[in-house]
């Protein structure tokens, strides 16, 4: 069977996807270890039987709802490719605004803390774009291992490292100029209603407690001992709860200039506190 025939078969096989042909193209390129442009330009080329079998399996996973990023093992974020697996959330485009806000603030070799780092997308992106020293924490040893590998692959491991720990606990007694956190913020009661792609992601990276802000309450209690001068705090949350998080942040830091920053879609997504 030819490349073009396999692409047509794959498109039909992932019909449950919102973008079946695009997904089939990605999966076929992955199965054949080729670029997408090659697939499109070489429709008459034959496909080896082993590669065809592999492609069928990949399509079955996608049709069952598994996210493309988990199948391919990589996800794009802020112009770079990050290794991902089911021990971490898949980086979201809306989270890139946290990086942009941090970049506007960072001047020189400041110290940055990324709490709940996951695959290290935020931390590694900041380290790649600035001379800052970036540390990250995560409760999951598997996430920290993955983030460490991403830092190595991106060439920033000399200034970007990660530790296993609960929120900022591993860095108690240290001071930071930028603290960024994208903690679990989905209310527990909302988890069963989430669409299939999210159901493949680790629950502990999604569950924000009864109102989605449980971990942020704890983090805000820890932050006063971690702040250097000047300092920027960036916290991502869901649009329905962002106002409450902003009020909590203002209460924790009465002298701070607290604002809500929209994401690329114009949704209120980030609390920004300048101290």
Tell where the protein language model's regions lie, with residue ranges:
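Non-catalytic nucleic-acid substrate-recognition regions in nucleic-acid-modifying enzymes
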Residues: 1-21
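Short helix-capping segments at alpha-helix termini
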Residues: 17-18, 130, 152-157, 250-257
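Conserved AdoMet
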Residues: 26-104
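Residue-level signal for inorganic ion chemistry
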Residues: 27, 65, 95, 122, ...
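Active-site beta-alpha loop architecture of Rossmann-like, nucleotide-cofactor-dependent enzymes
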Residues: 69, 186-189, 240
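Conserved SAM/SAH cofactor-binding pocket of Class I
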Residues: 93-192, 197
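Glycine-rich S-adenosyl-L-methionine
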Residues: 139-144, 196-228, 232, 238-242
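C-terminal catalytic and target-recognition region of SAM-dependent MTase-like enzymes
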Residues: 232-275
